[in-house]
Amino acid sequence: MKGKNTVFFIMTFGTLLLMASCGTLRNGRGWGQDATIFPGWRRLGDVAVDTMTTPVVWVPLAGALLFQVDHLDQRLSGWASKNTPLFGSNHAAHDASSFFSEPTRYAYIATMLATPSGDTPESWAIAKLKGFAVGTVAISASNTTTNYLKRTAKRVRPDASDDQSFPSLTTSNAAVNATLASHNLDSLDIDEGTRSAMKYVMFSLTAITAWSRVEAKEHYPSDVLVGAAMGYFFGTFFNNAFLGLSKNNDIAIVFGPKQDGFTVRLFWSF
């Protein structure tokens, strides 16, 4: 399976690089060029509210709550892990979770590299480093929060192997990488049909990863639903708040290198 994942990565990476150019976005800026460590309190608040109120966040969270009714969580987990309708066995489902989650990581890296970030090698590299830093922090925040909740909740897994069931780290990791990759696709100069198809692939990889964890008897449905919601939240929040790709109505601070040191820029839109 790892070999197949490598092939998947190479194909995805190569295809996206063919789509890439050293140019800029439609606004004349490079992807990652305007990444900021402080986008402003108003911007942070607006993005947080917008992200929390999107269906991709609140629907899974609502679903996780519904699964607490009449022991639906335990009942579906028991049925899925016993019948294994998609993967045929708990072991195969366990292997599938890695097989389907790893490509989301590769897809994020590939789409990040494929985005237009400048006309010169220097500007391209600097913008990439800044943009990649935002994505790295998003992934780290998602993983750290997931692990904190695991230690706090201490929910025993369906197979009773440990008390780290809630929420699913594998699912949240797949979700945050898939979300970042999907946002990167919006910066690529490709037709809408291709963009939509690739976003569907990202969503499908996350969904299959989540279900495989349930069939593997390693998580309850609510574990993976919360994990998916968290991954999407952190991916979207950091992308929209810190990458500087959309209009910012608050003061922002941007750091950047220059020939003999660094520059600090203070700017706002009006």
Residue ranges of predicted features:
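Alpha-helical transmembrane segments of multi-pass membrane proteins
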Residues: 22-28, 63-75
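Hydrophobic alpha-helical transmembrane segments of multi-pass integral membrane proteins
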Residues: 60-65, 102-112, 176
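C-terminal TM-helix exit segments that contain a strictly Trp-centered aromatic cap at the helix terminus
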Residues: 65-69, 106-108, 144-150
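Interfacial/capping segments of alpha-helical transmembrane domains
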Residues: 73-84
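Interfacial helix-start motif at the membrane-water boundary
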Residues: 88-110
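Conserved, well-structured interaction surfaces
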Residues: 113-119
